């Protein structure tokens, strides 16, 4: 939603975005950002299993587990996007306001509201720290275990193979 809007704005020399367009853009950005975080964590777990438990890789990383991790990522991201979207819709705005950018950000919309935004701010900080911190923690834990496993390998050839597995 950002690129088509940007192309229209470049042609019309207009940087404003409508309220409906802003809500739509917010929802898609939150959806895809959340999915990206959780999918990166799933990829880190995949690398962890491939390096630290190579003999059990096919038993652990079955198609069913990959599907569950992907669908869980999608469901959590949809709930997050809907929750923020619905909380933005309950805000009231005193006057007709335009966001002077081609891209609509959650913080900008909350700042433009003339109603109480305490719940929105709490939700933003809670969801951001949870949906950012949990995947980040999983990624850090996975790569910590990978690095410690690689450092315990006796030969440099096996270390090289392990690092090349991480890079692929």
UniProtKB/Swiss-Prot annotation:
Biological-process GO terms, alphabetical: signal transduction
Extracellular-side positions: 1-25, 89-121
GO MF annotation list: G protein-coupled receptor activity; olfactory receptor activity
Protein's membrane topology: Multi-pass membrane protein
Gene encoding the protein: Olr1145
Free-text tissue specificity from the UniProt record: Tongue specific.
Source species taxonomy: Eukaryota, Metazoa, Chordata, Craniata, Vertebrata
Classification via Gene3D superfamilies: Rhodopsin 7-helix transmembrane proteins
Described function: Possible taste receptor.
Presence of keyword Disulfide bond: yes
Stored InterPro entries: GPCR_Rhodpsn (IPR000276), GPCR_Rhodpsn_7TM (IPR017452), Olfact_rcpt (IPR000725)
Subcellular localization: Cell membrane
Protein name: Putative gustatory receptor clone PTE03
Family stated for the protein in its record: Belongs to the G-protein coupled receptor 1 family.
Transmembrane segments annotated in the record for this chain: 26-45, 68-88, 122-143, 166-168
Disulfide bridge partners, by residue number: 22-104
